[in-house]
Every structure is written in structure tokens, then in C-alpha cells.
Curated annotation (Swiss-Prot):
Subunit structure: Homodimer. The tRNA molecule binds across the dimer.
Protein name per its UniProtKB record: Serine--tRNA ligase
Highest taxon in the source lineage: Bacteria
Organism the protein comes from: Hamiltonella defensa subsp. Acyrthosiphon pisum (strain 5AT)
Role this protein plays: Catalyzes the attachment of serine to tRNA(Ser). Is also able to aminoacylate tRNA(Sec) with serine, to form the misacylated tRNA L-seryl-tRNA(Sec), which will be further converted into selenocysteinyl-tRNA(Sec).
Enzyme class, spelled out: ligase
GO molecular function, one term: serine-tRNA ligase activity
PANTHER family xrefs: SERINE--TRNA LIGASE, SERYL-TRNA SYNTHETASE
Residues annotated for ATP binding in this entry: 266-268, 353-356
Name of the encoding gene: serS
Known catalytic reactions: tRNA(Ser) + L-serine + ATP = L-seryl-tRNA(Ser) + AMP + diphosphate + H(+); tRNA(Sec) + L-serine + ATP = L-seryl-tRNA(Sec) + AMP + diphosphate + H(+)
InterPro entries linked: aa-tRNA-synt_IIb, aa-tRNA-synth_II, aa-tRNA-synth_II/BPL/LPL, Ser-tRNA-ligase_type_1, Ser-tRNA-synth_1_N, SerRS_1_N_sf, SerRS_core, tRNA-bd_arm
Length: 430
């Protein structure tokens, strides 16, 4: 949510910054709503002042024993008018808030302008894709040959975009998440959390999934309940960030560095026909999520740090990747600045996103009403989040980049302790 004060005082500046995202701010609606709000505010305050004056006159008349019947009639009529004005103001304020919630975050000045992923800027590359002396297979073919990935059974159980993993492939998937958790807790200073896998609508509003992106979620409505509505989490960013919702934090407690390993659930409503093969785009997938809560002046440095923490996973796994600075048109709704990490997938002969690390500024903090206490006042925190990493896509990268000519998969050295020293995945465990 944008700063309402800046939106009112500098609407043209806000419009120019949003235009860099190819978002058109409806200035006429903004001005109309603001003018109407001011008028109703003045009207309501005048009616309240008159009511207070009449109440004082009634009290004074009672003391003097005067006939105050006419004053009672007037104050009752005034109450009806005031109630109507207050209701009208409340309805308008709801519309104003809905309008404000529909606005994306303002991009940082360092973010390049562009319409889509073709305009993103490559910052650096690490590692070189291997040169194979044999035709490299994709992860689907590898997984099926090793009988470790079963998409047919998953389709019978739940439909498309699900998978059943078994044997050493399932163990490799688990080893990846354990390795990531250990790295981020032991070396990078994150506190691990276990969080709910479904959340209420207030939480989704706080991090920006609602009201705009409701169709991307799997919603849960308990039978016989009209008010208890939930959704499965699309990312652990939602429960982790909302742990500080409606709180005033001590400045000395910042930064907060939180982490969770959870399944993530996404409807992929806008992805029909895209990545229908394999593990790249699933309705359910595991992810290790990193979240930081910082002071405003520290958030850009924290973004570099958080992104480096995600990069460490790829480096230790010796997976080639590149770091991309997203352009204004490709950033997420609530992001101020975003880096994507794209890992090389030998089966697709291309780089694919495996982590997205974003500085949200105070966008989420305003929605959640999360502040920290300074010596002079309470200020909104800045929030950051990033994947450290998406476990399924990391599994894909390991399978495709560590495949051997005989169809086996070499287990990366850093993962072998998590797999009882196993060096190669050759066939399914009995």
C-alpha cells in the first residue's frame, strides 16, 4: 500500500513513477474521491460540533429548569443527519481504501524501465554449463527411467501439475531442503519457523495477494461457515511476514531474519499451456523462504545480502546460474526492486528462475500496520523476501546437471551427508 499522504500531496509524481511500471493511475478518480472525502469530513465535523453545542445547551437548560423539548427534537433530527453523513463517509473511505489497495508499489529509481522479461538486465553469471559427450536428458525422462518421478499416479490422485516422488529421488528432494535449512540457520543467521499452511484473508491482504490476485490462490471455505474463509499459502512469505502484523517492534530487534520450509500451493490460473511437462510449474511444490524485516535505511543492503544467501545454495551445489535485475514491467505487484536467480537447466538448454528476491519497502508494512519504535516516533518497517530456494526446481537442476551417461545421477558432494553417503542414484530402492 502506498503512503496515502504522498498520494494526496504528490499525485502527479506518483502517477509518473507508476507509469514506469506501465500502470495508469486514475487521477480523475483520485481527485474526485479526495474532494468528496474533504466535503464529507467537513460536513461531519460541523454536525458533530453542532451536536456537542446542543448537548451543552440541553445540560445548561436542565440546570436552569427551562423547557428543552425543542432542543431534544432538534438533537434527535441532527442525530439522523449525522448518522447518514457518517455512513456516507465510511462507505467512501472503503472505496478509497479499495482504490489504494489496487495500486502497485513504486519502483526504485535503480530499477530499469521495461515491459517484460526481455527487458530485464543480466547482472552476472556464475559457473559454466557442462559439455556432455552424450545426449542429455530432461528431468522427466531421467526421473521416469529411475522410477523416481510418477506423474501418472499423481494425475489419478489429484489431476495435472502434481507429482509423486519415491525412493532416492524423494530422498534427494528431502536432502535439498535439509541442506538449505542448515545453511541458512547455521551460516546466514535465520531463525527457522514452522507455520500454518493455510491463512486467513487478513494475512493475504497484508502481504498483497488480496484483493488483486485471489484467482491465483486455492481457497478454503469450511462447511456451514460464512465468515471463516482461508486460502492455502502460495509461499511462506505470507505467514512469516504476517508474524509481525499490527506490531510495534523495538528498533534494537531489527533486522529480523526468518525462514520456513513449506509446501506452496498455486492455482496457476494464468499459466494455461505453459510448462505442462515436469516439475517446473506445479500446483504444489516445496520452497525454503527467507524473510527479513529491517529499518528503511537498511533495506537495500539487506536485499543484496538476502540475494547472496540464495546464491550460496547454488554455488555450494555447483549449479551454473545468472543473476537478473528485473525491469519495472516484470516486477511483482508489491516489489520495489527484485533480483531473479536463474539456474541452467541442461534438459531445456536455458536458464530458468529458481529464486526471486525482493525489497518490498514499506508497501506490506502499511497494509499490516507494522512499525518500529525510535526515540522520537514510530516508523514503518521495510520487508524483504526471497526463495532460498524452490526445492522442486533445484531438484530439476541437480538431476539435469549431474546426470551421467549410464542414466544415473551423481549426488552433489554437499548433499551426500544427508543421503548416508550415497554417491549415485542408479535405481529405485526396493
Amino acid at each position: 500500500m502506498l503512503d496515502p499522504h504522498i498520494l494526496r500531496k504528490e499525485p502527479h509524481t506518483v502517477a509518473e513513477k507508476l507509469a514506469r511500471r506501465y500502470f495508469s493511475l486514475n487521477l480523475s478518480m483520485l481527485f474526485e474521491q479526495e474532494q468528496h472525502r474533504k466535503m464529507l469530513q467537513v460536513k461531519t465535523e460541523a454536525l458533530q460540533a453542532k451536536r456537542n453545542s446542543l448537548s451543552a445547551s440541553i445540560a445548561e437548560g436542565k440546570k436552569k429548569g427551562e423547557n428543552i423539548d425543542s432542543l431534544y427534537i432538534e438533537v434527535n433530527q441532527l442525530k439522523i443527519t449525522l448518522d447518514s453523513a457518517q455512513k456516507e463517509l465510511e462507505e467512501l473511505q472503503k472505496k478509497i481504501r479499495a482504490f489504494q489497495l489496487s495500486l502497485p508499489n513504486l519502483p526504485d529509481d535503480s530499477v530499469p524501465e521495461g515491459k517484460n522479461e526481455e527487458d530485464n538486465q543480466e547482472i552476472m553469471r556464475w559457473g559454466q554449463p557442462k559439455k556432455y559427450s552424450f545426449p542429455a536428458l530432461d528431468h522427466v525422462t531421467l526421473g521416469e527411467k529411475l522410477t523416481g518421478l510418477d506423474f501418472a499416479s499423481a494425475a489419478q490422485l489429484a489431476g495435472s501439475r502434481f507429482v509423486v516422488m519415491k525412493g532416492p529421488i524423494a530422498r534427494l528432494h528431502r536432502a535439498l531442503s535439509q541442506f538449505m535449512l542448515d545453511l541458512h540457520t547455521k551460516q546466514n543467521g535465520y531463525t527457522e519457523f514452522y507455520v500454518p499452511y493455510f491463512v486467513n484473508h487478513d494475512s493475504l491482504l497484508g502481504t498483497g495477494q488480496l484483493p488483486k490476485f485471489g484467482e491465483d490462490l486455492f481457497h478454503i471455505e469450511p462447511l456451514g461457515s460464512d465468515d471463516k474463509k482461508y486460502a492455502l499459502i502460495p509461499t511462506a512469505e505470507v505467514p512469516l511476514t504476517n508474524l509481525v502484523r499490527q506490531q510495534i517492534l523495538e528498533e534494537s530487534s531489527l533486522p529480523l531474519k526468518m525462514m520456513a520450509h513449506t509446501p506452496c500451493f498455486r492455482s496457476e490460473a494464468g499459466s494455461y499451456g505453459r510448462d505442462t511437462r515436469g516439475l517446473i510449474r506445479m500446483h504444489q511444490f516445496d520452497k525454503v523462504e527467507l524473510v527479513q524485516i529491517t529499518r528503511p535505511e537498511d533495506s537495500m543492503r539487506a536485499l543484496e545480502e538476502l540475494t547472496e544467501h540464495a546464491e550460496q545454495v547454488l554455488k555450494k551445489l555447483e549449479l551454473p546460474y545468472r543473476k537478473m535485475l528485473l525491469c519495472t514491467g516484470d516486477m511483482g505487484f508489491g516489489a520495489k526492486k527484485t533480483y531473479d536467480l536463474e539456474v541452467w537447466l541442461e534438459g531445456q538448454k536455458t536458464y530458468r528462475e529458481i529464486s526471486s528476491c525482493s525489497n518490498m519497502g514499506d508497501f506490506q508494512a502499511r497494509r499490516m500496520q507494522t512499525r518500529y519504535k525510535t526515540a522520537s516516533k514510530n516508523c514503518f518497517v521495510h520487508t524483504l523476501n526471497g526463495s532460498g530456494l524452490a526445492v522442486g526446481r533445484t531438484l530439476v537442476a541437480v538431476m539435469e546437471n549431474y546426470q551421467q551417461e549410464n542414466g544415473s545421477i551423481a549426488v552433489p558432494q554437499v548433499l551426500q551427508p544427508y543421503m548416508e553417503g550415497l554417491e549415485y542414484i542408479k535405481n529405485i530402492e526396493k
